[in-house]
C-alpha cells in the first residue's frame, strides 16, 4: 500500500529485499504507482529510520524524504506526506 500526496495504490507488488532491510516495491498490475513512480525504495539508514525514493519512468530518482517505522503497523514506513507499507 502506497499513499502519497493524495494518491493511493493498494494492490500486488513485486518485493525485492536488499542488505540491511532495504527494500524496493514495484507495482504488478500497472506501470506506475498513483504518483507516477515505477518503483519505490526504502533505504534503511538506522534501526527504525529510512530514506525513501521513487524512480520515475524518465529515470529520475526522486527523494521522497525521511520515514520512520510505524508503531501501529511494523510493515509500514511513514514520512511527512507519504506512507509505504509492504505486506
Language model feature labels by segment:
Residues 1-87:
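Cysteine-centric segments in proteins
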